[in-house]
Swiss-Prot record:
<keyword id="KW-0808">Transferase</keyword>
<feature type="active site" description="Proton acceptor">
    <location>
        <position position="184"/>
    </location>
</feature>
<dbReference type="GO" id="GO:0003864">
    <property type="term" value="F:3-methyl-2-oxobutanoate hydroxymethyltransferase activity"/>
</dbReference>
<comment type="subunit">
    <text>Homodecamer; pentamer of dimers.</text>
</comment>
<feature type="binding site">
    <location>
        <position position="115"/>
    </location>
    <ligand>
        <name>3-methyl-2-oxobutanoate</name>
    </ligand>
</feature>
<dbReference type="InterPro" id="IPR040442">
    <property type="entry name" value="Pyrv_kinase-like_dom_sf"/>
</dbReference>
<comment type="similarity">
    <text>Belongs to the PanB family.</text>
</comment>
<protein>
    <recommendedName>
        <fullName>3-methyl-2-oxobutanoate hydroxymethyltransferase</fullName>
        <ecNumber>2.1.2.11</ecNumber>
    </recommendedName>
</protein>
<dbReference type="InterPro" id="IPR003700">
    <property type="entry name" value="Pantoate_hydroxy_MeTrfase"/>
</dbReference>
<dbReference type="InterPro" id="IPR015813">
    <property type="entry name" value="Pyrv/PenolPyrv_kinase-like_dom"/>
</dbReference>
<feature type="binding site">
    <location>
        <position position="85"/>
    </location>
    <ligand>
        <name>3-methyl-2-oxobutanoate</name>
    </ligand>
</feature>
<dbReference type="GO" id="GO:0000287">
    <property type="term" value="F:magnesium ion binding"/>
</dbReference>
<feature type="binding site">
    <location>
        <position position="46"/>
    </location>
    <ligand>
        <name>Mg(2+)</name>
    </ligand>
</feature>
<comment type="pathway">
    <text>Cofactor biosynthesis; (R)-pantothenate biosynthesis; (R)-pantoate from 3-methyl-2-oxobutanoate: step 1/2.</text>
</comment>
<keyword id="KW-0566">Pantothenate biosynthesis</keyword>
<feature type="binding site">
    <location>
        <position position="117"/>
    </location>
    <ligand>
        <name>Mg(2+)</name>
    </ligand>
</feature>
<dbReference type="Pfam" id="PF02548">
    <property type="entry name" value="Pantoate_transf"/>
</dbReference>
Length: 274
């Protein structure tokens, strides 16, 4: 069996120029498939709020939601590095609150690292969690928990001052001890500049080809998600169509009494005549 992916593995991949692969999972069977395929990193994202719980944003997602889904994923995984999102307001009140919640995702959920959104304003919290022995992944650019403050799901860092802030935030988070950095919806030139100037791996989502790795929401790239698909998503399969075809075939066969047939039914044992 391949060696488990760790923070050291991720740094090694960056140093060697080997691209890191990452996708999301929120349940046991999906995580098992991803792990068996050899994905390097699995994110149990608070995106589960929109993808599987039906919320309009990530903001209503709770710590209990995150622990519940992280547990399911961690039971399935043998090799991949599991990162769990810290949900909205689970690390903003105090360092003590942040460390307690981060510890729960590791100890109860089975995650290997936690992910926090934000830059310089959360650097001291990141450092406190790292100093407690918990690996932290940073997240800059479009940060969904701040979607109302950002004015919607828009590309960040297009203007010079904004780009400078994102770059500086990346350096500050590196100093705070992050093990990796997610860059979301920023110009590829900015992502390239950050990637070349920090020692930790960058994982891009809508950040161009120059990051050390890439992540997408699994439901988006497999064609399960309904509604708007972001520009940066490439759809690799149409699982929704496969599901619809299968379900419609089942409905038809049940209604026409074609299922269950003899092959899928049980019969009484035939007794030998005495």
């Amino acid at each position: 069996m391949e060696e488990k992916v760790s923070t050291l593995t991720l740094r090694k991949f960056k140093k060697e120029g080997r691209k890191i692969t990452a996708l999301t999972a929120y349940d046991f069977p999906t995580a098992k498939i991803l792990d068996n395929c050899g994905i390097d990193m699995i994110l149990v994202g608070d995106s589960l709020g929109m993808v599987v719980l039906g919320y309009e944003s990530t903001i209503p997602v709770t710590m209990e939601d995150m622990i519940h889904h992280t547990k399911a994923v961690s039971r399935a995984v043998n090799r991949a590095f599991i990162v769990a999102d810290m949900p909205f307001m689970s690390y903003h009140i105090s360092k003590e609150q942040a460390m307690t919640n981060a510890a729960r995702l590791i100890a109860e959920g089975g995650a290997h690292a936690v992910k926090l959104e934000g830059g310089e304003e959360i650097a001291s919290i990141v450092k406190a969690i790292v100093d407690a022995g918990i690996p932290v992944v940073g997240h800059l650019g479009l940060t969904p928990q701040s979607v109302h403050q950002l004015g919607g799901y828009k590309v960040q860092g297009k203007e010079k001052e904004q780009a400078k802030k994102i770059f500086n935030d990346a350096k500050v988070l590196e100093q705070a001890g992050i093990c990796a950095l997610v860059l979301e919806s920023i110009p590829m030139e900015l992502a390239k500049n950050i990637t070349e100037n920090i020692s930790v791996p960058t994982i891009g989502i809508g950040a161009g080809p120059y990051c050390d790795g890439q992540i997408l929401v699994t439901h988006d790239m497999l064609g399960i998600t309904q509604g708007h698909r972001p520009k940066f998503v490439k759809q690799y399969a149409d699982i929704e169509k496969i599901m619809i075809d299968g379900i419609n075939a089942y409905i038809k066969e049940v209604q026409q009494v074609l299922f269950p047939d003899e092959e899928h039914s049980f019969t009484l044992e035939k007794r030998e005549n005495k």
